[in-house]
Amino acid sequence: MPELPEVETVRRGLAELLPGRVVARTAVFDSPKSFPNAPADVEQFLYGARVTAVRRRAKVLMIDLDTQYSLVIHLKMTGQLVFRQSSRYSARVSSNKSRGPRKVTQDFYADTAREIDDFAGGHPNDSLIGELPDRSTRVQIDFVDGSRLFFNDQRKFGWMKLLPTDEVKNLPFMQKVGPEPLDPNTRAEDFIQRIRRRQNSMIKPAFLDQAVIAGVGNIYADEALWAARLHPQTRV
């Protein structure tokens, strides 16, 4: 299962590749489970939108768009994001945004055109390097320049949602998430205080509590406890 370090690796990889790219169209192979948005919302807020940033909070990725919407992605147990290049093509996308229809062509992307490599991250299996889409592909996003982003998920626990950017922080699980272990402002003292609030619980479940520390799962909880020479069933 991708945990915080793996999801951060995906964020960094996509942050180098996606900003500036314009969405031309999508193909959803597992609707509505993996991508529950209504087609009208996808057409209005995703088609023709330009990627502005790729962010992460805990194990959740956010691809921000210039429509003030974001693609929010949770890889869960077996999720992957795979970016592939292909021959460039021209596409025209009309949307009924409040600012009016716009035509998106290859020239719309020309100011950020560059030669780059493919990227893949998430759960390790053959879909990271194989032909796509395959049987695990849930969502395919085509960009105006011909590149594509595939959301693969073998077990179908992961999801992708299109949400207003300013509403993402209000999602229930986002409001409960604790401090980021990679944030330089996160102090060991604060972490210890949060752990101590779980009095009489075993220390490993306390590590796995996302309200205590963000993004830690079984792998890194085990590694941290091994490094500290603490048994997972030690009481807080």
Where are these regions (language model features)?
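Extended, highly charged segments
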Residues: 1-69, 86-89, 96-97, 102-103
